[in-house]
Amino acid sequence: MLELRLVQGSLLKKVLESLKDLVTDANFDCSASGFSLQAMDSSHVALVALLLRSEGFEHYRCDRNPSMGMNLNNMAKMLKCAGNDDIITLKADDGSDTVTFMFESPTQDKISDFEMKLMDIDSEHLGIPEAEYHAIVRMPSAEFARICKDLSSIGDTVVISVTKEGVKFSTRGDIGTANIVCRQNTTVDKPDEATIIEMNEPVSLTFALRYLNSFTKATPLSNNVTISLSSELPVVVEYKIAEMGYIRFYLAPKIEEDDEEQSLEYQA
């Protein structure tokens, strides 16, 4: 028996909105530690890892460790039927080929339940090694989203460079070029508005903006984003989910010579 009750139901809606355009089908894994997902996009250039810790749920029951295959667009459609203030409960019996979403209004005067068929999805769980990164940038998530959106109106790729001067986002296209520099700024009144740069050595990498713009759909989940860069590793774009966990996006850099994305090469 699986039963997960989330008082802040809007959080699950936001999670699905941030995933559904990147990944079509995925397995949600349930264990004593939490509700998680790991999946690659169809081109094997981007990977997403999600964790919602068990203690963040009002009620969390997971008798076995089921893996539930779901179509994320279908799941998002069901969750759109929930009000933003609704309490969302996920239920599945052991061995069942369906999952039930129950939505309760805060005043308990309306209860809806939607049943969705599960899928059999073959997916390898990839081992993502812990790594030391050359540079880590923490900045307001809305600012990062704005930069990616603005640059994508000029070019298709962005060069992210971190030096002692700050972090620079650059692009070029048919109509011209654009450069945006963000310097370290820790003196702001609100910590959420700070930009913090930790650099062990300078780094400069090129990425496809269409993927970064997809990642920024997670902006409503967190006020801040952490971007971890290293010359021989995929970039990690992480949004912390308050008191619950995180959503991390991994993106392979483009190879300068032929301007093609590398495939992610984590071990299954």
Curated annotation (Swiss-Prot):
Residues 61-80 bind DNA. One of its GO terms (cellular component) is PCNA complex. SUPFAM superfamilies: DNA clamp. GO terms for molecular function: DNA binding; DNA polymerase processivity factor activity. It is found in: Nucleus. Keywords: DNA replication, DNA-binding, Nucleus. It comes from Catharanthus roseus. Belongs to the PCNA family. It comes from the Eukaryota. This protein is an auxiliary protein of DNA polymerase delta and is involved in the control of eukaryotic DNA replication by increasing the polymerase's processibility during elongation of the leading strand. This is Proliferating cell nuclear antigen. PROSITE patterns: PCNA_1, PCNA_2. InterPro entries: DNA_clamp_sf, Pr_cel_nuc_antig, Pr_cel_nuc_antig_C, Pr_cel_nuc_antig_CS, Pr_cel_nuc_antig_N.
